[in-house]
Swiss-Prot record:
Belongs to the SlyX family. It comes from Chromobacterium violaceum (strain ATCC 12472 / DSM 30191 / JCM 1249 / CCUG 213 / NBRC 12614 / NCIMB 9131 / NCTC 9757 / MK). Gene3D superfamilies: 1.20.5.300. This is Protein SlyX homolog. It comes from the Bacteria. The gene is slyX. It holds the Pfam family SlyX.
Length: 75
């Protein structure tokens, strides 16, 4: 019987160690996801700003028309 208790204690200890490592890993992964979300938010903001700057620099009613309407010289 004593051998059975020691075996169970060893198994419980091993599970507790695994749980501690998994908790640490989960915290690290959560920090990574939070950092990446901040980077994504910043990149989206920069893309919106660049898009607005592009739209302001290339109005469709500008003299010469839109670049989308130009035909390449080889046609």
């Amino acid at each position: 019987m004593a051998g059975m208790n020691t075996e169970n204690e060893n198994r419980v200890e091993a599970l507790e160690v695994r749980l501690a490592f998994q908790d640490e890993l989960l915290d690290a992964l959560n920090a990574t996801v939070a950092r990446q979300q901040k980077e994504i938010d910043l990149l989206q903001q920069q893309i919106r700003l660049l898009y607005q700057q592009f739209r302001n620099a290339q109005p469709d009613d500008a003299p010469g028309g839109s670049l989308r309407d130009d035909i390449p010289p080889h046609y």
